[in-house]
């Protein structure tokens, strides 16, 4: 009997519950590197677009695989995905977001250097990047800027590998520390900075120090509001993606424990790249790998008996392009049935 079949009493082995939960506003998809996070997030976005007014898919992974998945170039501005009328995507560069904040939009770097200001901008940037997790925090700040100007019903995050994802979720406290540090420096070295900046007291981007502080304070208030939403299970959930191997299972357990410490809801796990050897198969390698996968699948079902555990098969070709993603996405809501289960 195939291990892909689940007892009737178990949680439904699909992500249908996410589609049915109309109140969800924020959905994170994350896990260890190389387990199929991007494929899963793209596929979930496609399914959500069928039942939501508007969906935004965002990559916060520096690798930025959304463009490869949909065979379409995306950038830091939300853009409709070809073939859809209500599904958009964007890829955010955390470093670029920070540089925009510090250097200012459209700042003339050559002119700044000529005025002796370039060094000041570099110092501020070095100071900012010295704060742990600030790159992820600014990545989210860029997201908020987009989301506030465009009203999306649901936002899906294709996150960076596990460690970065968990740091990303600490951004409110990170920005609190950043603001405290800047305030401290401003009060301690304000006169010195004003003397260095000249009579107008302007930073390289043309802003004054108080203006920059005011913008950061507004950003902090917005992020605090969103952080409250993140801890509301009616508005936010996290989908864990893994494969049936020891390291991936270990990372998933660590991530679930840490999400719980942040009070962030998670009740769905997608297990990718599962082998389902055909009856009579003579592939010893396939059988051995299947036995290993079964061992870890059994552990997943035992550990997470109150989760929706979705089991996705290993495919013979890459899942790239709209048509293949749509086909893959169907298996997220309609459990995959191995060929031998039909007999």
From Swiss-Prot:
Gene3D superfamilies membership: P-loop containing nucleotide triphosphate hydrolases
Protein name: ATPase GET3
Record's keyword annotation contains tRNA-binding: no
Entry keywords, A to Z: ATP-binding, Cytoplasm, Endoplasmic reticulum, Hydrolase, Metal-binding, Nucleotide-binding, Transport, Zinc
SUPFAM superfamilies attached to this UniProt entry: P-loop containing nucleoside triphosphate hydrolases (SSF52540)
Binding-site list for Zn(2+): 283, 286
UniProt-listed CDD domains: ArsA
GO CC annotation: GET complex
An example Gene Ontology molecular-function term: protein folding chaperone
Enzyme Commission no: 3.6.-.-
Broad class of the protein's primary localization: cytoplasm
Binding locations of ATP: 32-39, 245, 272
Subcellular location per the Swiss-Prot or TrEMBL entry: Cytoplasm; Endoplasmic reticulum
């Amino acid at each position: 009997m195939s291990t892909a079949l689940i007892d009737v009493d178990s949680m439904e082995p699909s992500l249908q519950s996410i589609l049915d939960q109309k109140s969800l506003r924020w959905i994170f998809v994350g896990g260890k590197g190389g387990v199929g996070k991007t494929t899963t997030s793209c596929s979930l976005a496609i399914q959500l677009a069928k039942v939501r007014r508007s969906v935004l898919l965002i990559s916060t992974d520096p690798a930025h695989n959304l463009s490869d998945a949909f065979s379409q170039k995306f950038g830091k501005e939300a853009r409709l995905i070809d073939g859809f009328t209500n599904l958009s995507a964007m890829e955010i560069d955390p470093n670029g977001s920070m540089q925009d904040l510090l250097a200012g939009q459209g700042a003339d770097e050559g002119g700044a250097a000529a005025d002796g200001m370039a060094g000041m901008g570099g110092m501020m940037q070095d100071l900012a990047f010295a704060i742990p997790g600030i790159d992820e925090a600014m990545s989210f700040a860029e997201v908020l800027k987009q989301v506030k100007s465009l009203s999306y019903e649901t936002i899906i995050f294709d996150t960076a590998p596990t460690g970065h994802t968990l740091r990303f979720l600490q951004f409110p406290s990170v920005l609190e520390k950043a603001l405290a540090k800047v305030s401290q420096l401003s009060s301690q070295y304000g006169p010195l900075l004003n003397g260095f900046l000249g009579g107008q007291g302007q930073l390289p981007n043309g802003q004054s120090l108080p203006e920059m502080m005011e913008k950061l304070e507004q950003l902090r208030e917005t992020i605090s509001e969103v952080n409250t939403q993140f801890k509301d299970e009616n508005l936010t959930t996290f989908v864990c993606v893994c494969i049936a191997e020891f390291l991936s299972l270990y990372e998933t357990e660590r991530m679930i424990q840490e999400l719980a410490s942040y009070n962030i809801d998670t009740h769905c796990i997608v297990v990718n790249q599962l082998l389902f050897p055909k009856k009579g198969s003579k592939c010893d390698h396939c059988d051995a790998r299947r036995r290993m996968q079964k061992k870890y699948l059994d552990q997943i079902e035992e550990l997470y008996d109150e989760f929706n555990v979705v089991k996705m098969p290993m495919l013979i070709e890459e899942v790239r392009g709209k048509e293949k993603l749509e086909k893959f996405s169907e298996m997220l809501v309609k459990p995959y049935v191995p060929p031998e289960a039909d007999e």
